[in-house]
Amino acid sequence: MALVNGNYLKLKAGYLFPEIGRRVKAFSEANPDAALIRLGIGDVTEPLPQACRDAMKNAIDEMGTREGFHGYGPEQGYAWLREAIAKHDFQSRGCDISAEEIFVSDGSKCDSSNILDILGEGNRIAVTDPVYPVYVDSNVMAGRTGDANEGGQYGGLSYLPITAANDFTAPLPSTPVDLIYLCFPNNPTGAVASREQLKSWVDYALEHKALILFDAAYEAFIQDPAIPHSIFEIEGARQCAIEFRSFSKNAGFTGTRCALTVVPKGLMGTSATGEQVELWGLWNRRQSTKFNGVSYIVQRGAEAVYSEQGQAEVKALINFYMENAAIIRRELSAAGLTIYGGEHAPYVWIKTPEGMDSWGFFDHLLNRANVVGTPGSGFGAAGEGYFRLSAFNSRSNVDEAMRRIRAL
């Protein structure tokens, strides 16, 4: 008899986005002529940068020759891409990160889940609330939590509320924790963390020998030069942090798949017997065993992001989406809604109207305006009463969605 992983049975009824898909499918079947505008899931809509497309076309042509063919590549990523990432994304900002500390992968969502493979089951875990659901669900699947309570919070996790009441600034844990998930710019709220705020987290982690798992997937959308793009801009972070990044949102690689994880050499964890163990070696072994690497063609496309042409085209993409965010902020504010985020991230975080909860507002927009967004309660108990709209769409769709919502 094949036994299932019982931890999966502890998951709530459905992962947030499949539940959205279920409701949208039911609506579409009942209203086949409705012209839906999707501002929910954070998928990009604009074409890949020309520099990336050209690089991938050239790589395909290389693969068509015996001399240029590439089979299995290094599980950690090709050296030329790792070196470009280290130089442009980290060393240019004063971060002491080498190419060897960068692991190229097929998604930061995957890596932020897979990192649990090298971390023990007894860790005390802190997440913000609201939170990107993957951080919580992956811990549930791995058996790192208890059951969920009526509010959807799992035993064994410390929830750190980020709401308008605390200016979306996560408080430091009131009890010691070992793993801390941070995402800035934040998904879903769009909030950012100042240098001083990040320093307080690094100081906490160093004091308590905790590990920060820092998701910087949206760092390219930061508009203020004073706001850090990386946890490694903070002194001491090499001794307490792992960072996840992605090419999905800045360069449109959601359908192409390329990301990276930074594991500094010398970053240590503790074994059950109290021995100090370097996490770089464990992650390297994990990737070498379970991952065959990102394709040569895709990595050449990612490398082109760092060319002069690629940088200009990526900047244009980011500006386009941030202009969409500005339109959403302006129009919904004019409609009398209370708006947060959307200034350094492609997400606008909306306070739902009085007397309407998150899923109620979802159904209201779906049925009355034919606009799809994301209920805040799907990101955690503290997200109840909020709603997320994404700036990832065409300008015409964003304009039309705002016109419909304002007409309600």
UniProtKB/Swiss-Prot annotation:
E.C. number(s) listed in UniProt: 2.6.1.83
CDD domains cross-referenced by the UniProt entry: AAT_like (cd00609)
Cofactor needs: pyridoxal 5'-phosphate
Pfam families (alphabetical): Aminotran_1_2 (PF00155)
Enzyme class: transferase
Lineage: superkingdom: Bacteria
Residues bound to pyridoxal 5'-phosphate: 72, 108-109, 132, 187, 218, 246-248, 257, 292
Pathway: Amino-acid biosynthesis; L-lysine biosynthesis via DAP pathway; LL-2,6-diaminopimelate from (S)-tetrahydrodipicolinate (aminotransferase route): step 1/1
GO terms (BP aspect): lysine biosynthetic process via diaminopimelate, diaminopimelate-aminotransferase pathway
Keywords: Aminotransferase, Pyridoxal phosphate, Transferase
Binding-site list for substrate: 15, 42, 109, 132, 187, 292, 388
Residues that span the membrane, as ranges: none
Catalytic activity: (2S,6S)-2,6-diaminopimelate + 2-oxoglutarate = (S)-2,3,4,5-tetrahydrodipicolinate + L-glutamate + H2O + H(+)
PTM sites of type N6-(pyridoxal phosphate)lysine: 249
Gene Ontology MF terms: L,L-diaminopimelate aminotransferase activity; pyridoxal phosphate binding
Subunit note: Homodimer.
Protein family membership: Belongs to the class-I pyridoxal-phosphate-dependent aminotransferase family. LL-diaminopimelate aminotransferase subfamily.
Chain's role: Involved in the synthesis of meso-diaminopimelate (m-DAP or DL-DAP), required for both lysine and peptidoglycan biosynthesis. Catalyzes the direct conversion of tetrahydrodipicolinate to LL-diaminopimelate.
Protein name: LL-diaminopimelate aminotransferase
Organism: Synechococcus sp. (strain RCC307)
